[in-house]
Amino acid sequence: DSEGYFIQPTTILTTDPKFKTMEEEIFGPVLTIYLYDPADWDAIIDLVDSTSQYALTGCIMGKNKEALAEAKDRLMHAAGNFYINDKPTGAVVGQQPFGGSRASGTNDKAGSNLNLLRWISLRTVKETFDTPTDYRYPFLEKD
């Protein structure tokens, strides 16, 4: 007795890397798959980094440790939460910091003390108890 929308778990196989579900932030059980030639790996990483204006979560699956490390490093700004060989829906607030960047947010990490930094303005205060009598900095003088 309520109205609303429900998305059945959906898998989409596309030949277009700019397909709508590849570019948009969809909150539902939707997995879009784009197959690529492994010889195009370098260009594919650039494509992944530039495909979407959103950057909430992302994941990569693979066995090649060097490729996984390269993807992690090169896709630094493509996902606020980046998963390697794990599902990209596993963040539990209070157990793992969670937050995205780009159009997905300010990359504040809810569930961690880092989130507090968005709400404060840091300031340094220095008080001297032994008043200096010399205005010069001896270490700046020529030898």
PLM regions: where:
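Conserved PLP cofactor-binding pocket of PLP-dependent enzymes
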Residues: 1-5
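Conserved C-terminal structural/oligomerization subdomain of aldehyde/semialdehyde dehydrogenase
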Residues: 6-143
